[in-house]
Amino acid sequence: MSLSSGASGGKGVDANPVETYDSGDEWDIGVGNLIIDLDADLEKDQQKLEMSGSKEVGIPAPNAVATLPDNIKFVTPVPGPQGKEGKSKSKRSKSGKDTSKPTPGTSLFTPSEGAASKKEVQGRSGDGANAGGLVAAIAPKGSEKAAKASRSVAGSKKEKENSSSKSKKERSEGVGTCSEKDPGVLQPVPLGGRGGQYDGSAGVDTGAVEPLGSIAIEPGAALNPLGTKPEPEEGENECRLLKKVKSEKMESPVSTPAVLPIHLLVPVVNNDISSPCEQIMVRTRSVGVNTCDVALATEPECLGPCEPGTSVNLEGIVWQETEDGMLVVNVTWRNKTYVGTLLDCTRHDWAPPRFCDSPTSDLEMRNGRGRGKRMRPNSNTPVNETATASDSKGTSNSSKTRAGANSKGRRGSQNSSEHRPPASSTSEDVKASPSSANKRKNKPLSDMELNSSSEDSKGSKRVRTNSMGSATGPLPGTKVEPTVLDRNCPSPVLIDCPHPNCNKKYKHINGLKYHQAHAHTDDDSKPEADGDSEYGEEPILHADLGSCNGASVSQKGSLSPARSATPKVRLVEPHSPSPSSKFSTKGLCKKKLSGEGDTDLGALSNDGSDDGPSVMDETSNDAFDSLERKCMEKEKCKKPSSLKPEKIPSKSLKSARPIAPAIPPQQIYTFQTATFTAASPGSSSGLTATVAQAMPNSPQLKPIQPKPTVMGEPFTVNPALTPAKDKKKKDKKKKESSKELESPLTPGKVCRAEEGKSPFRESSGDGMKMEGLLNGSSDPHQSRLASIKAEADKIYSFTDNAPSPSIGGSSRLENTTPTQPLTPLHVVTQNGAEASSVKTNSPAYSDISDAGEDGEGKVDSVKSKDAEQLVKEGAKKTLFPPQPQSKDSPYYQGFESYYSPSYAQSSPGALNPSSQAGVESQALKTKRDEEPESIEGKVKNDICEEKKPELSSSSQQPSVIQQRPNMYMQSLYYNQYAYVPPYGYSDQSYHTHLLSTNTAYRQQYEEQQKRQSLEQQQRGVDKKAEMGLKEREAALKEEWKQKPSIPPTLTKAPSLTDLVKSGPGKAKEPGADPAKSVIIPKLDDSSKLPGQAPEGLKVKLSDASHLSKEASEAKTGAECGRQAEMDPILWYRQEAEPRMWTYVYPAKYSDIKSEDERWKEERDRKLKEERSRSKDSVPKEDGKESTSSDCKLPTSEESRLGSKEPRPSVHVPVSSPLTQHQSYIPYMHGYSYSQSYDPNHPSYRSMPAVMMQNYPGSYLPSSYSFSPYGSKVSGGEDADKARASPSVTCKSSSESKALDILQQHASHYKSKSPTISDKTSQERDRGGCGVVGGGGSCSSVGGASGGERSVDRPRTSPSQRLMSTHHHHHHLGYSLLPAQYNLPYAAGLSSTAIVASQQGSTPSLYPPPRR
């Protein structure tokens, strides 16, 4: 609370700004108000104490206030006391308002007051600033009044900062404001003087300063809970104050005399409370304006954060005790007041182990892990964080320790001391909260990120944290929840942590488990966590993480990021916290997660530091991405866990969804699995994982691990998808199991892979077998190697963000893998920073390369058969890519099958698990391809297609690892969040709604459908002949996923024909385009995968023939990767995001499930229809394909196109979902991108962004992330797609013209921005292409908008919209509108130009947006 006041005073924004606190206020349980009131009561009590002290001093409390000025004057001189002075100022403020009351409470409470008062205000006024839990709890209610006055007074500072009125009040009250500035002399105005002196900046109102001063540590700790953010938020003054307080606090000892004088003068309160303050957060409001509570040696500011294993006795007030074993308390420690929710360890194993001797050991571990306890620096904030953590934890009831911890805990409570003390047990407890095991490794941090999405539900606080890896960073501190306060129940026997570098001792096994899950499982992923931000989406993974909450949960889980899926939100249940946290955004998840307990823990793990929580979180976040966290208690605990593990800070990333969404971004993301899981039936788990990704670096990585399990269960989840909560539960449970498996797996990716495999096997025996065959032993082996590499990579290179994305990616992949174990394997393996990479690299690439090189035929047949079987099977269907693989033979199969899962996950989620997996792997691969393939494309353009894919595989494998950090950060992060979105587009109801309400959408949809039908007919016939209905169905499924791609596919088919007509060279290029067209659409969709798209684009640009070969090869291999990758990513972003949105809500999940089936039916039916229609086009298509591509290209391309055509067909059949999604996606996308961050990714998931996945996360990130994520890719991808698109579009408009322009631009952009620009320019130039391609693929964003608008505006509308959506990905809001509306058409070139410029700039935008 103090923090609050600090925020209040320090933060001009105090009253409201305490968004953190507000968030605290929001506490899901409503404990916020309770806590606030309790704080107020505490404050009153303490005020009484202080007043007594004051009276002792000889100043009645009222007088104290009135006299306080004089007292304060005395105190004023005390610079050190100023911290207390801050409080005293509070008092003064109080005195201003409440002359009598404020003395004790005020001075001490200034922060408190600010906090308590604010708290009350918040509670009452809704003053979030009151978060300063420090004194808030302690500050008397009078203090509250005073706080208000104080706030006014303290506002002085604040006034400067924000509330001048209060300042004025304070000034009025504190006549000596002028003297405030006098450090030693507070005489002029006790109130102002002190503040002034304390806060040089707030000469007038030291309220904030004084709170800081009075809290010397409190400002940082209590005040800073909010203060940390407040430092940032209150920032100018608060920060300064904090710093001053810190320095002065340090000086405080020197100032102590002044402080003592304050005690003497103002009240003994200082004396009274001095010791209590130390003991009780009461901070003895040393009302004596000079309440120095003298920076006692015991003050954290002076002492620094309490070491984790420290056993402490806390004095406090019990605000509430529930029958379910939850205790809400305000405790004073080191003169800082912490509000926390304590859980009965007999009932809540997941709660931070109260028996952990070194509850903060996790924090320390975090530190060791690399986050270095980001919070620690702001040692004060930690409490807040802790509180927040507990809040996040999902101490649903007033877990709101956040109140005590100050809502800003997540990010704000970065102060170690604050966080630390409570951390002592909290951290551990929180960590334990994940059920200790794997749930909360530092994944939670990532998850937190993802949770960001999910945290959305938590409120900005969590979101803040989630959305920012840094917030997550502080999370660790937050984790420590004041609630835990005395959690470190001494245990007779201390259990030593077996970890080599860990010397933590825990009294309770849960503490150890929590610690291990958190610190050590995270250790591998911690770096990831560090780099990572979470969902998240769910971004995505974020985004998927991305994701988001409630819906978020979906986002966070699937939408979980929604947040991301981010995915950021956590459930109240302790175990749920992780998942809850992930889903926390989803209030639902809260309880479900809590119900899930261990499973949830796993999920929570995904959400939290653990893989499980991470997954959820990532996804949520995502996308990655955010439901889990909101599980209040669980969520809080978990979130704290998430936060706790510096992973989140690590993950400051990311979304992931997983984020990621995962998200999703999300989420992200949770960045971010959860998100995906929620988002799509198939990808639901993945989403959640991603979200626990969305959007969820380290956590995401872990989420990824759980993801395999999730993926294994995706189908199960799919059914669960309908009930987002149930699904999340399942996902969480599965994730939990996965995570638990992965917990160990984290260290051993092999295990992970196995785990992933096992779940996947369960999920898709065929898919898994197929994957196994495809990947063969090499896959597992490579997977492990890749995992290891990824782990190392994420630890070193990507540590912070990459892991999260990885997780997001992994989550997604894993989700994807429900059908394809390999993907999960990869996901699992990739778990770390290399989830996608590993997948792509090890399984996809390795398999493709191994299968392709060693046994293409083998792969082909195996894959073919497997693919067919898979297709036949629901999961197999998801594996439609295997069919394409058969088409593309070894490579395509490898990639398709491999990617397909991703793909499936990406769009349909459950529908195309393999597709999604493909997306994941492809996203990674594209990224990987970006470098290798770009190089290869250029260098090896002439090399055979096969060689190139192989090379791509091999070279990209390492590249992936190398790029993994980027990829993961970007792709995974995005995936985290993006994943969340992947489902969004599927929403039938939304589609229907749009159709009914949005004429433009309906028109576009109809156009798209028609276009799709025609093109699908053209290709469909061919494909049917080629692939057969089944393959086509699979393709359709994939098409769904790539529905944005589908238009390109459609475009491609016509384009191919036209291109072929254009000329052999051109035809060839178009051939490549078609091949790429297929890919490109996907690339477009997965703009985030710039590598591949750009590479393809470059290759195409470099050599049409080459491109043909490469396209054909790449198509099978890279393209497959691209398609799956980009498309999936894009799909995640565009489709998944909308889909996630759609599914952000349970309805979404149902939709996914029903849509899956419905799509299947539609696909079959439409496939048949298209067959008849296609027959006409087929010849064209065949000729086109044959002409366009090399022999392989024609076959693989055709196959691809076939599969893709079927996708268009699917698009047509699924047109409602798909087309709607295309149109819908743009809208949804725009939505996602606009609001998806929170709703989607954070939401959430990521929504990835579910982060959405992140993303930064899924939400915006989902689209933004998408843009940033695939920003490079976006351009390249789009260009690629555009290229492919142009083939199609060009055919409609001017193929040759488009191609020429394409080439022109390609060369232009090539030199300019080869990877992205090329494609982008091509794509843009390829306006015509954009028509079909644009509609089909986002890549047409620019091109479709520009070229297509003239040629096929109607058709382009949806396409353009998609493109715009893609564009949106790059430029969240900008394209959104154009995409949504026919602006692009109307905008024409300008829009295209903008898109081009945006896409061109996307790369630059890309990283930032991603983050």
Curated annotation (Swiss-Prot):
Q: What ranges does the record give for the region Disordered, renumbered to this chain?
A: 1-26, 47-190, 353-484, 517-659, 679-963, 1005-1125, 1153-1221, 1270-1367
Where on this protein does the Glycyl lysine isopeptide (Lys-Gly) (interchain with G-Cter in SUMO2) crosslink form? 479, 789, 1061, 1153, 1297
InterPro entries with a match to the protein in the record: ZN608/ZN609, Znf_C2H2_type
An example of a GO molecular function for this protein is: promoter-specific chromatin binding
Q: Does the keyword Transcription apply?
A: yes
Induction remarks: Isoform 1: Up-regulated during neuronal differentiation in retinoic acid-treated SH-SY5Y cells. Isoform 2: Down-regulated during myogenesis.
Tell me if Transcription regulation is a UniProt keyword of this record: yes
Residue spans of biased composition, Basic residues class: 726-736
Q: Where is the composition biased (Low complexity)?
A: 897-908, 952-963
Tell me what happens on changing residue 37 to A. Answer: Abolished interaction with INTS13 component of the integrator complex
ZnF segments: C2H2-type: 495-520
Offer a single GO CC term for the protein: nucleus
Any Gene Ontology biological process: regulation of transcription by RNA polymerase II
In-chain residues carrying the UniProt-annotated modification Phosphoserine: 358, 361, 379, 413, 433, 446, 452, 467, 470, 533, 576, 578, 743, 758, 804, 842, 846, 849, 1055
Give compartment(s).
Nucleus
Q: What does this protein do?
A: Transcription factor, which activates RAG1, and possibly RAG2, transcription. Through the regulation of RAG1/2 expression, may regulate thymocyte maturation. Along with NIPBL and the multiprotein complex Integrator, promotes cortical neuron migration during brain development by regulating the transcription of crucial genes in this process. Preferentially binds promoters containing paused RNA polymerase II. Up-regulates the expression of SEMA3A, NRP1, PLXND1 and GABBR2 genes, among others.
Q: What is this protein called?
A: Zinc finger protein 609
